[in-house]
Amino acid sequence: MKLKKVLAAAMISLLATTALVGCGSDKKSADTGKKVQIEYWHVAAESFGGATVKELVADFNKTHPNIEVVEKYNPDMYKGLTQNLQAAMASGKNPDVVQMGYSFLNYAAENFKYTDLNEAFKAAGDENFMKDNYLPNVLQLAQTEDGKQIGLPYSVSVPVLFYNPEIFEKAGLDPQNPPKTWEEVSKAAKQIKDKTGNMGFFMQEYADNWTQQALIESNGGQMLTKVDGKVKAGFDTPESAAAYQVVADMVKNGSALHATNEEGFQAYLSGKLGMVCTTIGKRANFEKGAKFKVMASPFPAFGNKPTKIPAGGNFLMVFSKDAEKQKAAIEFIKYLESPEALAKWSTGTGYLPPRKGVADDPKGFKKLADENLNIKMALQEMTKVTKWASFPGANGLQAEQLLIDARDIILSGKMSAQDALHQTAEKINKLL
């Protein structure tokens, strides 16, 4: 079954329903009876779930007197975290639990010594935890192509179009009928700029290519392809260039922003931006910070073409080198993945929970999921998801950065989308 079908099934079900192990394990620690301290690395900035991370860690520490979790925020999203992890492991200072982005799954599997979660849960006396609480298709999000379970899905998100209904009304647009295609987005952005003086559109510019993948593949392009069994850049096509050029043209005519996320998101929250295309994971931050009613609609399509949106977010990996730390890490993961904790995480961010039945659990976020139209819409979007492209090999991080650099070149008008993507594909293929 294809990923978009199995993930759709997973989300429908969600609504209805002391041995040392692992690749990086090389020693045991004596059971001294002392408090075990573990590090939890994440990418949740204060404006993106940071407060919820602190709340969850504090709750866990209160209820687990023999374990102390120390959380550490890593800037620059998953690329920044992965680079920091690489440096830490090279110096022998492994963190214990890490939020790894789905786009770095292949890189992490091939370049890091990680703990085998199946064996780790077995050692903790709960070998059926994953099988009992997650559909096989959801677990696949954190599996390599050869079926290795290198982590446990934690956060799931989709890209959506947030908009300001008050700006829409001032511009003569209907808030109940937001843009459904990129042609309509372009026209609406220009109309907002011309009639209100506000900027019309902004697409997130994190240190990744998540929304850009959605853009490219929804127009019939692809991020990666295989040639003679080898992975190659697949975005050097007319379809990919045309998709990217849509956003570049909006920036060129002055109706869209090319800016940092902080600038773009703040413009939206302050009522100076009509539309922002970003993760549903920003829902809670937007709804809390805006003085207007935050509304969201599905990721726009290219004409009648079906949209293809990568499942964003992260999965949890364990890198503990000490048996007691490893055991504590598994205990912490079980807490983070509990219905109660997932409810707090989803409520505090906007991420969709991966565990079966959380939305129907009275300890889960059933009430919020039933009442919040933005959440309902995001859950329905799960029928369209594809896998987030992950560059393989030792040069995966460099390849990812080259494509990020291409985004800046295109949106700044230094080069056309066609030329920039062509040159970038050539560079990436040499690396891969």
Q: Can you annotate each of these PLM segments?
A:
Residues Y102-V158, S186, D194-T196, A214-L215, ...:
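Hinge/lid segment of periplasmic solute-binding proteins
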